[in-house]
C-alpha cells in the first residue's frame, strides 16, 4: 500500500492498480493473492468488485444490486455546481451549516447541498458551471469521489460541464480554466 496525502494506491503484479480513500470506510479484500475494494462494505468479494470479470459481467451484477432509487439517481444530472459555491445567490450552499469562510474548510470541500444530492438523491452525474482554478477543481473532484466511495455500492461521480471550447463561451464557464483551453468556432460546421 502506497499512502499519499488523501488516498492510497495498491499496485499489483499481474493485476489492477487500486486507488482508494482510507476515510471512506471501504475495506480491502484479498483473493488469490490480489487486492479488491469492498465497495458495498459487506465483507464479500462480489462480482462487480472483482476486476477479473468482464465489464459486462460486472455491470450486470451491479445492476441487480441497485434499488429503484439508486437507478433513478444514476439517470439524473445535478443542477449547475460552482466550485466553491457562493454563500448567497443562485449557486449558494453551506459547508457544515455555515459559509465556506466561517467553516474553515478548503475551497475544494464538498458543500452541504452537494453531499445531500449525492447521499440522499443518489446522483452521480454532476454538472460544473464554474471553478476557482484547475487545482481546486481536481481536489474537489477527489473529495467528491472519496465521499461517494463510502456510499451504497461505491459508484463514482461523473463530472461534466457545459461546452467550454467555443470562442463565444461565457466568462463564467471559462473562469477557472486558467486560459489553458482550446477555443473553436461555434458551430464547427461539420
PLM region descriptions:
Residues 2-190:
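N-terminal beta-rich core of secreted/periplasmic extracellular enzymes
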Amino acid at each position: 500500500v502506497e499512502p499519499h496525502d488523501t488516498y492510497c494506491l495498491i499496485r499489483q503484479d499481474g493485476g489492477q492498480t487500486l486507488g482508494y480513500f482510507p476515510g471512506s470506510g471501504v475495506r480491502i479484500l484479498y483473493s488469490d493473492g490480489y487486492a479488491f475494494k469492498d465497495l458495498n462494505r459487506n465483507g464479500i468479494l462480489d462480482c462487480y468488485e472483482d476486476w477479473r470479470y468482464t465489464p459486462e459481467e460486472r455491470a450486470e451484477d451491479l445492476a441487480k444490486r441497485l434499488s429503484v432509487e439508486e437507478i433513478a439517481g444514476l439517470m439524473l444530472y445535478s443542477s449547475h455546481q460552482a466550485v466553491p459555491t457562493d454563500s448567497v445567490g443562485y449557486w449558494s450552499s453551506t459547508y457544515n451549516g455555515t459559509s465556506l469562510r466561517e467553516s474553515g474548510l478548503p475551497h475544494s470541500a464538498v458543500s452541504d447541498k452537494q453531499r445531500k444530492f449525492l447521499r440522499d438523491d443518489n446522483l452521480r452525474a454532476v454538472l460544473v458551471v464554474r471553478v476557482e482554478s484547475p487545482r481546486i477543481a481536481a481536489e474537489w473532484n477527489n473529495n467528491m469521489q472519496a465521499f461517494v466511495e463510502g456510499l451504497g455500492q461505491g459508484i463514482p461521480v461523473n463530472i461534466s460541464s457545459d461546452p467550454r471550447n467555443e470562442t463565444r463561451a461565457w466568462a463564467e464557464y471559462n473562469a477557472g480554466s486558467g486560459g489553458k483551453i482550446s477555443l473553436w468556432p461555434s458551430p464547427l460546421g461539420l
